[in-house]
Amino acid sequence: MWITDGDSQVPATSILIDIGPDFRSQALKSSINRLDALLLTHGHADHLNGLDDIRIFSHTGSKAPCGVNGQVKLYPETEGDGLPVYGNSNALQDVHQRFSYIFQPVLEGGGKPKLKTVDCSVFSEDNPIIIGDISIIPVPMLHGHLETIGWLLLKGYKGVGFGPCRGIAYLTDCNKIPSESLALLRRFGPYLQHLVIDGLRQRPHSTHFSYDQALEVALEIGAKQSWLTHLCHDMSHVQIQCYLADKLSQLKQDFQCQPAYDGLVLEI
């Protein structure tokens, strides 16, 4: 998921949530030309294995022989400490283990991503991550027995006792949201234009919300519009739309929920 703030062509802030193996093709298709931060939900391959392709946005310096006279070409390093990568301890451990070369001394000829990993456990509603004008609060969740992180992104947030703000919650790969996290989401629910929530399929699953479970949680949070993500292929997009429409018709309250899709653009 790519979040931007400001001009769509030259965004003031550019944030990525997760970086799957097809990140490069998605970045080219969406014309992503800079990043300010990467937020990780967890370290499973479909959410992390495109990490090496982030080097175009933040990279170490390198040198390589060129020509026949033993000349060496120098490639300058990106300024600063490196692109910040936020995640819980599990996700960051996966980063350091599976991409260990990133954190080792630069080898001759080898440019690589320049990253700064940051444990998100130190951030909260009282102490959000601030990137540009966007405030970001980590939301602890469970994906089976694995602790994952959802992300609450807010514009105009002034802290606890907040006044009007608006935002989006991104809650993928979960089958349980702890009570404290759910209470946090409920507090911000009236200010959320969008909720993107895990909903794998109609049948129950051991590590993902089903459609009905996702609807139940989405109703409790109360965002203006909810979207199901991480969908499997048991049903087509249209079939899921019809299923949700039938479920929503049984509710007495005004509630909107649709299946998400590749290339979906949401505005807050």
Language-model segments: residues:
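Binuclear metal-ion centers of metallo-dependent hydrolases, dominated by the metallo-beta-lactamase
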Residues: P178-I268
